[in-house]
A protein has these predicted regions:
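Short, flexible, mixed-charge glycine/proline-rich loop motifs
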Residues: 61-69, 78-83
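Short functional micro-motifs and their immediate structural scaffolds
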Residues: 81, 97-98
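Short hydrophobic/aromatic patches at helix-to-coil boundaries
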Residues: 109-113
Length: 113
């Protein structure tokens, strides 16, 4: 489960941001997870709940936003959100596409006190 190592890095990042802003605790952590990121939201939630104890995020709420796959079609120049895992442009059906979102995980925001 690589979610544990992801959460450890996430908690370190939260601590760095809190320290840099003079905060004593983090009350909310918001992340965005792309459906192609390979990160399982349920496992990430479990890992966060496990590892946040005795950290600056001890009482933090953890919010996960799921990002669908967004593409740009090189043929018709359309931006689209894929509804299923069919990697073709929904407008012209070309497979000459570039994924523009939905592959990564990002720390979107922190609420600090």
């Amino acid at each position: 489960m690589h979610e544990y190592s992801i959460v450890q890095s996430l908690l370190e990042s939260c601590e760095e941001h809190a320290r840099a802003n003079g905060a004593k605790k983090v009350t909310k952590v918001v992340v965005k997870i792309g459906v192609l990121s390979g990160v399982e939201p349920e496992l990430l939630q479990t890992a966060f709940d496990t590892f946040k104890e005795k950290t600056i995020c001890d009482s933090a709420e953890f919010s996960i936003n799921i990002q669908k796959v967004e593409i740009f079609c090189n043929r018709c120049n359309a931006n689209s959100t894929l509804q299923k895992n069919e990697f073709a442009c929904p407008k012209c059906e070309s497979v000459d596409i570039k994924v523009t979102d939905g592959e990564d995980m990002y720390l979107m925001s922190l609420e600090l006190e």
